[in-house]
From Swiss-Prot:
Region (Adenylyl removase): 1-440
Designated name of the protein: Bifunctional glutamine synthetase adenylyltransferase/adenylyl-removing enzyme
Enzyme Commission number: 2.7.7.89, 2.7.7.42
Record InterPro entries: GlnE, GlnE_rpt_dom, NT_sf, PII_UdlTrfase/GS_AdlTrfase
Family designation: Belongs to the GlnE family.
Organism of derivation: Proteus mirabilis (strain HI4320)
GO cellular component: a single term: cytosol
Upper lineage: Bacteria, Pseudomonadati, Pseudomonadota, Gammaproteobacteria, Enterobacterales
């Protein structure tokens, strides 16, 4: 039988219940007949209150009428001064608005998100207005609750779940948590109560007013079990008590519940902001948090078992692919990444799905499918509940309700609707299973169980095939001993039962991967300090235990580099970077570092300097890890590694200068002369490896600061200082930001001794003084240093002035003999002080025939021949300087190529030793050919 024919019967049935007053409103339109046939709930209320139908006819429901709920309800309560009248009006208001919402959603006068918002705002209005009315009455009876300073204290109500997310369904419980800001006592009452007593009594009254069944029904079923300690806990808690609870005892399911928590009725008031900020760190962790996957998986398993136990069939909320699974999917990403991606910290499921698509955490097709299924199921759920105002998500088993739903959902019959429901839920179930999985294990169980015995019992596996074939019996025994020592170290740490469970699940998987490596013992000895450092921070253990990809990368990178192992140990936040192998081994474009850092810093409030310092360090460490991973994988050749490290440093310098500038301008205003010039009148010049595009993994930054500012200029702020003093303090601030040690360490070590007159000179020089010094006072070694100098930060005007000074200085005519002698003597001093004394070793940098010799040759040639060939001053890096020497025939092309080849070869070895955290010293018989090329050129240019 079609839904239309059944509807005619339902209309006939509904008419039989009509009251005399309702019949007086006949004739009824076709739409009205359909509505009466659909909803016995609405029919019953219109039978008793036929004037509600008159109001619908005169002012049909519209999508934004939720904006009037508060004013309408307050007007009706103007003269109410007792609880009985309050309860009656609240119930009547609730029923009338639900009838209007039922009409609106049945005829699709507004879409599903709008319906959910109307239902949520209705509940919020009823709760908040009732609370305010009762608060006034309680204050009259017991006085006003105040803090120690006499400031009145409000009751704040956290709406949880769908109410908090503005996604409430038609017939729903409401989950609430009550809180108040500070302890104290009431003032102005007949007798004094402490605030806890006052708010407990207020909370009890509010629950009664909303929840109690009267002749008019009820407003909402109130559930307070989500509060701290559940039913055994106090009904109301102070902010401090709440914070203590969630920091010390908050559980995973409570984090899940708090994702949608929203302060009802007063989101913009000061106490609401305080409460939200207090709860945010509990819900959203600063690191990527994988612990939630297993927790949500366990919760889903519990729900599934309950569904089976209670024989729930066709449940569109709790069944496979139902509404709850869509909520789980979005909240997985919110809880895992919400601390790092503030856009995910939304109460709205649909908003979060859009962000998930934007961040490419799921494909656009998957998020679109989830949104489509969600809206379909939520409309179905609301229609189902509006039939009889019953809190149910189970599809009906009677023909009448099946016909009602099929008609309202736009289907000809139940079978077509049911088929569509199954298709929508099946699509959700596939995505849910791929993301969260089932609570079972099937991966290499036999091998892992062997290593489980090794970990738990200290017994080596019987089969040697589980180890790399190159590992001897002694190696395997040493692995066993390393694990024993590791277990002893762990026993001295504070680690709870959950942490032990995760570690016991992780270690067999880790050992199964490590023991297949030829350097298994070395890798294990590098990884165990990392594990020891995070063993009390269960989330990181869960990250490796949960993600096989992360675990694989940890083993691979620790195998390749102790430097990376040490970085991960010192800064476990870097484990987050291993989640995406595509980005881990995909170099950023060189010009993208500044924009990437800018976007990274958008997550941090500009005024929070401490967080920004931490963010800068975390960004640097994450990018260093990526560059090192790309270096190890052979994605980047050695020269490109230095390019990336240099561009990274430049991006950070720009960010630090801007942060320091903002700080100074807030205190003193800008130097007044900037009104007549573009830019900041300030420059940062990079020397040494930074200037020469040759930074290594642990290089310092050699910086010189310049300014362009006339004498006797003041700043424009309320607190004025001399502008040159401003620039001096700016440079000091920059160095402070670089060198401050936070929990993530120092950003860079900064060396400013290459400035004019060295440590005895001014920290910041005017560009004019710099020009004068370079041309008239600087030593030859300072001109050598100037060759490798380039401006890292500065406006166009300063850039041109610096470039002119550098070019003119390097092009000065020099006595060739004197120059050669001074460069040679400086090089000899360096060899005496820095080169190793053992004849059987070779320092890649300091020994004769090493990198420094190549640098001195290039620098000598620039100083010697730039007067003749001014174009030789163009570049600051050694490779391109040597290319210029060949181009202008200062040296033969063959000599330039051999020096370049030697330079790149030695630099490559230097990088690999840095990754292994080894000194830049090799055996004396290494790189003989390259050293001979260098010594031959050195003898030709510096020793003749």
């Amino acid at each position: 039988m079609s839904a239309n024919s059944v509807f005619q019967q339902l209309w006939d049935k509904a008419q039989c219940t009509f009251s005399t007053k309702l019949n007086e409103l006949a004739p009824f339109s076709e739409r009205e007949q359909q509505f009466f046939a659909f909803s016995p709930f609405a029919t019953e209320h219109l039978r008793v209150n036929p004037h509600w139908l008159t109001e619908i006819r005169q002012t049909p429901p519209v999508s934004d009428e939720w904006q009037n709920y508060s004013s309408q309800l307050k007007q009706q309560l103007t003269h109410v001064d007792n609880e009985d009248d309050l309860m009656a009006i609240l119930r009547q208001f609730r029923h009338q608005q639900l009838v209007r919402i039922a009409w609106s959603q049945f005829f699709q006068l507004c879409d599903t998100p709008c319906t959910l918002k109307q239902l949520s705002v209705l509940a919020e209005t009823l709760i908040s207005v009732a609370k305010d009315k009762l608060y006034q009455q309680c204050c009259q009876q017991w006085g006003t609750p105040c803090d120690r300073e006499g400031k009145p204290q409000p009751l704040l109500i956290l709406g949880m779940g769908k109410l908090g997310g503005l996604e409430l369904n038609f017939s729903s419980d409401i989950d609430l948590i009550f809180a108040y800001p500070e302890n104290g006592v009431t003032q102005g009452g007949r007798r004094e109560l402490d605030n806890a007593q006052f708010f407990t009594r207020l909370g009890q009254k509010l629950i009664k007013v909303l929840d109690q069944h009267t002749m008019d029904g009820f407003v909402y079923r109130v559930d307070m079990r989500l509060r701290p300690f559940g039913e055994s806990g106090p009904l109301v808690m102070s902010f401090a008590a709440l914070e203590d609870y969630y920091q010390e005892q908050g559980r995973d399911w409570e984090r899940y519940a708090m994702v949608k928590a929203r302060v009802l009725g007063a989101e913009k008031k000061e106490y609401c902001q305080i409460l939200r900020q207090m709860l945010r760190p509990f819900v959203y962790r600063r690191y990527i948090d994988f612990s939630v996957i297993q927790s949500l998986r366990n919760m889903k398993s519990m729900i599934s078992r309950e569904v089976r136990r209670r024989g729930m069939i066709d449940n569109i909320k709790l069944g496979a692919g139902g509404i709850r699974e869509i909520e789980f999917i979005t909240q997985v990403f919110q809880l895992i990444r919400g601390g790092r991606e503030p856009e995910l910290q939304s109460h709205s499921l649909l908003t979060v799905l859009n962000v998930i698509a934007k961040l490419e955490l799921l494909s656009a097709q998957e998020t679109s499918q989830l949104a489509d299924s969600y809206l379909f199921l939520r409309r179905l759920e609301n229609l189902l509940q509006s039939i009889a105002d019953q809190q149910t998500q189970t599809l009906p088993d009677n023909l009448e309700d099946k016909a009602r739903l099929a008609f309202a959902m736009g289907f000809d019959d139940w079978q077509m609707l049911y088929q569509q429901i199954n298709q929508k839920m099946q699509a959700v179930s596939v995505i849910f299973t791929q993301l969260i999985g089932e609570d079972d294990e099937n991966e290499d169980e036999e091998d892992v169980s062997e290593f489980k015995r090794l970990w738990l019992l200290g017994r080596l596996p019987d089969s040697a095939t589980l180890f790399h074939q190159g590992l001897t019996a002694e190696d395997r025994q040493a692995i066993c001993q390393t694990l024993q020592l590791f277990r002893q170290d762990i026993s001295k740490r504070t680690i709870g039962p959950r942490g032990r469970d995760v570690l016991d699940a992780l270690m067999p998987k880790l050992l199964a991967k490590v023991c297949l490596q030829p350097q298994a013992l070395v890798i294990l000895q590098r990884i165990t300090p990392l594990l020891l450092g995070i063993v009390s921070r269960t989330t990181y253990l869960e990250l490796m235990q949960e993600s096989d990809e992360v675990l694989t990368h940890v083993v691979r990178l620790c195998a390749a580099s102790p430097m990376i192992a040490e970085q991960l140990t010192r800064h476990p936040l870097l484990l987050d970077e291993l989640l995406d192998p595509h980005s881990l081994y995909q170099p950023l474009p060189l010009n993208a570092y500044q924009d990437e850092l800018r976007q990274y810093l958008l997550r941090v409030p500009e005024e929070d300097e401490e967080q920004r310092l931490e963010a800068l360090r975390q960004f640097k460490q994450a990018q260093l890890l990526r560059i090192a991973a790309e270096d190890i994988a052979g994605v980047l050749p050695v020269m490109k590694v230095s390019d990336h490290l240099t561009y990274l440093a430049e991006a950070i310098i720009h960010a630090v200068v801007h942060q320091a500038w903002s700080y100074m301008v807030k205190r003193y205003g800008e130097p007044a002369h900037l009104a007549q010039r573009d830019g900041l009148g300030f420059a940062v010049v990079g020397y040494g490896k930074l200037g020469g595009w040759e930074l290594g993994y642990s290089s310092d930054l050699d910086l010189v600061f310049l300014l362009d500012c006339p004498m006797n200029i003041l700043t424009t702020g309320a607190k004025q200082i001399d502008a040159r003093q401003f620039y001096l303090r700016l440079a000091q601030r920059i160095i402070h930001l670089f060198s401050t040690r936070t929990s993530s360490g120092v950003l860079y070590e900064v060396d400013a001794r290459l400035r004019p007159s060295g440590e005895s000179g001014m920290l910041v020089s005017t560009i004019q003084a710099f020009d004068e010094y370079q041309k008239n006072e600087a030593w030859t070694w300072e001109h050598q240093a100037l060759i490798r100098a380039r401006m890292i930060y500065g406006d166009d005007q300063l850039q041109q002035m610096f470039a002119r000074t550098r070019h003119e200085t390097l092009c000065l005519a020099r006595n060739a003999t004197v120059l050669q002698q001074e460069v040679r003597e400086m090089r000899q001093k360096m060899v005496q002080h820095l080169a190793p004394t053992q004849s059987n070793t070779f320092d890649l940098k300091a020994s004769s025939g090493g990198i420094t010799d190549i640098e001195f040759i290039a620098q000598y040639l620039v100083l010697r021949f730039s007067h003749q060939y001014p174009a030789l001053t163009r570049w600051s890096d050694n490779v391109r300087i040597l290319e210029l020497m060949a181009k202008y025939q200062v040296m033969s092309e063959q000599e330039a190529q051999l020096l370049t080849q030697a330079y790149v070869t030695l630099r490559n070895e230097l990088h690999h030793l840095a990754l292994q955290t080894l000194p830049a010293v090799v055996d004396g018989d290494c790189f003989i050919t390259e050293r001979q090329w260098v010594l031959s050129s050195k003898q030709k240019w510096l020793d003749e």
